[in-house]
């Protein structure tokens, strides 16, 4: 991937037909991209929510309530999701060092290995899809997607997502 900065185009004025069309196209592309990500995840035995949990835990241990909030799911849903990951040996529960009544979830070595395989499979899928655009655009598309991930993390840190 190139280290060259991505040149931002001046976006069309908000509320114009052109901006509305681009936003609709982007929203639909995001939905299609989510589907394209689930294909390689299935090949490594993960669902999209499981992948997201493993990726979150790769950043550090987390309590079920924190994971539920980050995934925007209910506590019962996160409990079921975590039970499956614990059963598979990808995640382990540990007592919270600050509050013995709470548990924290930790990514195991098998979980880290599975996450690495999933990252690689998804990355390969993105590269394969990117070959269907003009030469050089694939690298820019992947870099732009990575930057969008940075924007999501920044918005989450600012409390706006």
Language-model segments: residues:
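Exposed, interaction-prone assembly regions rather than primary DNA-binding/catalytic cores
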Residues: 137-161
């Amino acid at each position: 991937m190139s280290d060259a900065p991505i040149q931002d185009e001046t976006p069309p004025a908000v509320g114009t037909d052109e901006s509305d069309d681009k936003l609709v196209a982007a929203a639909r592309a995001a939905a299609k991209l989510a589907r394209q990500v689930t294909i390689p995840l299935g090949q490594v035995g993960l669902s999209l929510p499981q992948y997201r949990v493993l990726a979150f835990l790769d950043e550090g241990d987390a309590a079920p309530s924190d994971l539920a909030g980050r995934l925007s799911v209910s506590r019962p849903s996160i409990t079921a999701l975590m039970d499956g990951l614990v059963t598979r040996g990808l995640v382990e529960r540990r007592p919270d060092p600050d509050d013995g009544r709470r548990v924290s979830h930790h990514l195991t070595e098998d979980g880290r290995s599975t996450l690495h395989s999933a990252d690689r499979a998804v990355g390969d899928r993105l590269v394969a899809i990117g070959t269907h655009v003009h030469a050089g655009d694939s690298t820019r598309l992947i870099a732009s997607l990575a930057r969008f991930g940075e924007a999501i993390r920044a918005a989450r840190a600012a409390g706006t997502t």
